[in-house]
């Protein structure tokens, strides 16, 4: 079996908003990497045994007395090191150079003139018409290196940054003041490939097929002949987790699908058809709609609704798990960003992956071992694995759907009538987006039920029914978002269909709020 962790890159996080992008780019190249806090110990680095190290950017200033520094062992480990932005500055400072706050801060696009073609910049040139090679890059820095450490040479400059890139090829140390991990840097992926593959010598073994093979082997080793229970929602993470476990242990996997009455139109039937009929999984469907709706009566505050939905789910799932007396393991679809965010919420830092770490917080009374086959993977990697396992692309690439489901898309108190109306209206919205080839042009689209009534006219009669709002946004990272400028004729068609086909809705509005100031979801 291929050892997909044999060659690996260690990324030390100094707090940049782009740090996870570095890891995703390295994985995209085909090499495993992990993201750790900047203040790891020498012992931890030795144990990880990286093939190369990348120092991320960060918001601090190296000119400040207590600003973060890389562990000294980083520069004594005998492996290549790449410093990005702040990572380059701390490398320079720690190896004997100088940095200072720049009079001309650089934020946004810049053109770097390459002064020397070292291994990092081999075959890179974004401007073939210029006499000297240039790179179009993305800058985001206020400090700059003003004196090189001994043994380094300048490899790139800009008009306001005399040391925009540097290298000491004898020690395989490299620094760039720009961000190769962002797509705005045209040749950024090629530069990172030069470092990871060309300089570090990593083999590209991190592929979907190899990841599946490794995950299946590790599941078999962990659980043996024991039985495992999994809460299957039909979402990407739990679906891929289910198929990996099914491939590893077959009928020893028990999937529990809790139909809470807060799902999209026909979603429960689709989950059963996909995983029960097509893939042959051992799946139990629990119709718990009444239980959820009863618990939600009289609750209109969003956070209280979320907590109630979460508690009822745990209670329902626990009831089912007690019926399966031979189960010894609980599987979860935890992914790598969950691990990073969980660690950060507790310590303010990203931490080392630790096996059997319970990100979600199991109730104390559920005495089960934990299986998390996706905990090393980013979302885009999970989707690639899902495709390789046979899941349809349209399912894997669906827009995000909140954990509480329609519970946070029905504003105020949740009632079955409201959910039924919303399901039908939302299905029409999504259907028309697909027909008009707009579904994949927007990042997320959904319908919100507003608990207010509005006067309308239907034929010769007057109607007084509910209002729904359409929401469609465009975003890269979901941290900020713009409302999608859908064509007026498309919006008109969607509105007309909803009002005419969904008895109980008299008015359709379109949400044109950005994030910020609004959030993407209404609750």
From Swiss-Prot:
Catalytic machinery residues: 85 (nucleophile), 179, 181
Record-level GO cellular component terms: cytosol
EC number: 6.3.5.2
Molecular function GO terms recorded: ATP binding; GMP synthase activity
Residues covered by the Glutamine amidotransferase type-1 domain: 8-205
Reaction(s) catalysed (UniProt annotation): XMP + L-glutamine + ATP + H2O = GMP + L-glutamate + AMP + diphosphate + 2 H(+)
Pfam families (UniProt xref): GATase (PF00117), GMP_synt_C (PF00958), NAD_synthase (PF02540)
Annotated residues for binding of ATP: 233-239
CDD domains with a match to the protein in the record: GATase1_GMP_Synthase, GMP_synthase_C
Catalytic class of the enzyme: ligase
Assembly, per entry: Homodimer.
Protein known as: GMP synthase [glutamine-hydrolyzing]
Native source species: Actinobacillus pleuropneumoniae serotype 3 (strain JL03)
């Amino acid at each position: 079996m291929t050892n997909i962790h044999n060659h690996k890159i260690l990324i030390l996080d100094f707090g940049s908003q782009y740090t996870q992008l570095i890891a995703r780019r390295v994985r995209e190249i085909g090499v495993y990497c992990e993201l750790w806090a900047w203040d790891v110990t020498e012992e931890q680095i030795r144990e990880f045994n990286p093939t190369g190290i990348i120092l991320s950017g960060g918001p601090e200033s190296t000119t400040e007395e207590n600003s973060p520094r890389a562990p000294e062992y980083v520069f004594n480990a005998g492996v290549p090191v790449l410093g990005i932005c702040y990572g380059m500055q701390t490398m320079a400072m720690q190896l004997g150079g100088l940095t200072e706050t720049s009079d001309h801060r650089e934020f946004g696009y810049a053109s770097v003139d390459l002064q020397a073609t070292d291994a990092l910049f081999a075959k890179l040139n974004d401007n073939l018409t210029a006499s000297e090679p240039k790179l179009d890059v993305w800058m985001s820095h206020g400090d700059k290196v003003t004196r090189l450490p001994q043994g380094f040479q300048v490899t790139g400059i800009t008009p306001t940054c005399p040391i925009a890139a540097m290298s000491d090829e004898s020690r395989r140390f490299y620094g760039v003041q720009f961000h190769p991990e962002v797509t705005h840097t045209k040749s950024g992926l090629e530069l990172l490939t030069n470092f990871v593959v060309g300089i570090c010598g990593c083999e590209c073994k991190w592929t979907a097929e190899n990841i599946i093979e490794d995950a299946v082997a590790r599941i078999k080793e962990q659980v043996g002949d024991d039985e495992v229970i999994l809460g299957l929602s039909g979402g990407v993470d739990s679906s891929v987790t289910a198929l990996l476990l099914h491939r590893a242990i077959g009928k020893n996997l028990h999937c529990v699908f809790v139909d809470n009455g807060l799902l999209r139109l026909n979603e429960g039937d689709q989950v059963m058809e996909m995983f029960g009929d097509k893939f042959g999984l051992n799946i139990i469907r629990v119709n718990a709609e009444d239980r959820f709706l009863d618990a939600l009566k009289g609750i209109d505050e969003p956070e209280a609704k979320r907590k109630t939905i979460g508690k009822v789910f745990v209670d329902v799932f626990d009831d089912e798990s007690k019926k399966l007396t031979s189960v010894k393991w609980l599987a979860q679809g935890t992914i790598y960003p969950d691990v990073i965010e969980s660690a950060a919420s507790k310590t303010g830092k990203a931490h080392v992956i630790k096996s059997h770490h319970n990100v979600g917080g199991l109730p104390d009374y559920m005495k089960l071992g934990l299986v998390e086959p996706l905990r090393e993977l980013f979302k885009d990697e999970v989707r690639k694995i899902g495709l390789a396992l046979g899941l349809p692309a349209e399912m894997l690439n669906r827009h995000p759907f909140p954990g509480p489901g329609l519970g946070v898309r029905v504003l105020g108190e949740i009632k079955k009538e409201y959910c039924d109306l919303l399901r039908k209206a939302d299905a029409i919205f999504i259907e028309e987006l697909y027909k008009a080839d707009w579904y994949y042009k927007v990042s997320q689209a959904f319908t919100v039920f507003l608990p207010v009534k509005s006067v309308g006219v239907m034929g010769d009669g007057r109607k007084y029914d509910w209002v729904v709002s359409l929401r469609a946004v465009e975003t890269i990272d979901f941290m900020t978002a713009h409302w999608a400028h859908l064509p007026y004729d498309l919006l008109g068609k969607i509105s007309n269909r909803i009002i005419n086909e969904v008895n109980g809705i008299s008015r359709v509005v379109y949400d044109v709020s950005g994030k910020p100031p609004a959030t993407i979801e209404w609750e």
